[in-house]
């Protein structure tokens, strides 16, 4: 562990000590919009500490929204959390992890089981979170990748939109792209796995290695929201959202900037989609 990693860990510990106690109190008193302000401030500060520079384009939807993004790393949570007042959807085993599980509970993460038999309970938990006024961030790939491409999206991630009361909930595709790492944006020495956490990598060593580096620059593109009709094909919807996400990736140059996108606040009615049932 080098000096940079030590300093970053110390700064992160101080950040947790500064923000976690008041957030714990807020959640005991009120779980409304005010309880979502500190997590966003926490993620912004954590990005600075970790050397994560976020380059955003487009604009997140207003109101209740399900943001569907590709997934490269556990660090994606800090990146997206610095831009969104939203709760993340995560596998339930994270809830039991030391420290990390506690921190994710403080930001009102929705924990879900991967057991197919728990599908109804998962849908109910997501509906409950949205009904409380929260927006959600989910990773429909169901795992992380190195970010060169986007894995197939699981159609089960979108069954929620067939439930009653979802008509006014936005669905917005989001592209996460690694633009630079350790001061390099392409070519020799571009170590994608310094940021990307996938395969058989271990969380602790991967995080320490990143903390000892010069950090990374990550692009986030908010695509136009998709209007989901009442009668829709779940697999077609998953494919459409994935195509939107893929369209935000640079085809060959890992250092290429994301194409510019409108900066105005997005509307759920901005992009009707042809995803009717087949």
List each model region and its residues.
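A transmembrane-helix-recognition feature enriched in membrane-embedded lipid enzymes
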Residues: 1-55, 102-106
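Short histidine/acidic/glycine/proline-rich micro-motifs that form metal-
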Residues: 29-32, 94, 143-146, 227-228
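Generic beta-sheet signal
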Residues: 64-69, 134-140, 169
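A cross-family acyltransferase "interaction/gating" segment
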Residues: 100-101, 115, 148-232, 240, ...
């Amino acid at each position: 562990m080098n000096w940079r990693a030590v300093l970053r860990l110390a700064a992160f510990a101080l950040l947790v000590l500064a923000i976690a106690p008041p957030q714990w109190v807020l959640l005991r008193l009120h779980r409304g919009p005010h309880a979502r302000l500190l997590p966003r401030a926490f993620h912004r500060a954590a990005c600075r500490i970790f050397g994560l520079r976020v380059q955003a384009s487009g604009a997140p939807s207003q109101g209740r929204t399900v943001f569907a993004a590709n997934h490269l790393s556990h660090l994606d949570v800090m990146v997206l959390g610095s831009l969104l007042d939203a709760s993340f959807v995560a596998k339930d085993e994270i809830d039991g992890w030391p420290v990390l599980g506690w921190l994710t509970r403080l930001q009102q993460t929705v924990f879900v089981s991967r057991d197919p038999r728990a599908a109804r309970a998962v849908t109910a938990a997501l509906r409950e979170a949205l009904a409380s006024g929260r927006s959600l961030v989910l990773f429909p790939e169901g795992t992380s990748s190195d970010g060169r491409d986007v894995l197939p999206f699981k159609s089960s991630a979108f069954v929620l939109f067939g439930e009653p009361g979802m008509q006014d909930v936005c669905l917005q595709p989001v592209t996460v792209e690694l633009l630079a790492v350790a001061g390099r944006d392409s070519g020799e020495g571009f170590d994608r796995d310094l940021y990307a956490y996938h395969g058989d990598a271990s969380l602790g060593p991967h995080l320490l290695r990143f903390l000892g580096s010069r950090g990374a620059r990550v692009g986030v593109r908010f695509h136009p929201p998709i209007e989901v009709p009442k009668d829709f094909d779940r697999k077609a919807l998953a494919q459409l959202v994935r195509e939107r996400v893929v369209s935000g990736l640079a085809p060959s140059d890992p250092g290429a900037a994301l194409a510019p996108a409108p900066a105005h606040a997005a509307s759920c009615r901005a992009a009707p989609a042809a995803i009717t049932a087949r």
